[in-house]
Amino acid sequence: RSTLFPYTTLFRSSIKKEYYQFLKENRYEKVSNGIYIHPEAFEDRNYILSLRYPQAVFSHEEALYYYGWIEREPIRPTLTMYTGFGVGRLNKEGVKVFTVKKEFLNEGKVMGKTFFGNPIPIYDRDRTICDVIRSKNWFEIQNYQYAILSYVKDDNKDLYQLMKYASMFHVKEKVRQTLELLL
């Protein structure tokens, strides 16, 4: 007797029926392919995005908000993906997407928690501020300045790590000029 079930065999069996029967009986609603939510639960936008696009990392304004470095929640989610990933669907959904070379995507990636306590991938403080300085023209000036000042005051910053990221992304001089007067 085999313990391996090909995808098609598994879903031809009654498991699929039982699964959908459970969802129906408990009034779960489809949010996306393979993702269902109970009508009494709060929809956690960022957690759902992380399930739908597991290779994406929350970044830029989304990370700034997570660390408390901007005052208001971003209107649009902000993700970083690897160059070459088709971002058209995400853009249509109102998600702002930045791209990097595939080998840099996971540099500085850590796991954070959404407001609802669900795990999501997000960049660490130093990678976040490096990305902000790299993408300065994308930010409103007051958000940019507030983020830089917040980073400088943050006890958990790691300037050595920041300069490693700055070197990796070829913005070492830009980072140095931005921070030298504040440190």
Predicted feature residues:
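Single conserved hydrophobic/aromatic residue that forms the stacking wall/gate
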Residues: 1-9
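A short acidic, leucine-rich amphipathic alpha-helix
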Residues: 8-12, 63
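Nucleic-acid-binding surface
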Residues: 31, 35-183
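Short amphipathic alpha-helical interaction segments
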Residues: 13-24
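Short alpha-helix boundary/capping motifs
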Residues: 12-13, 54
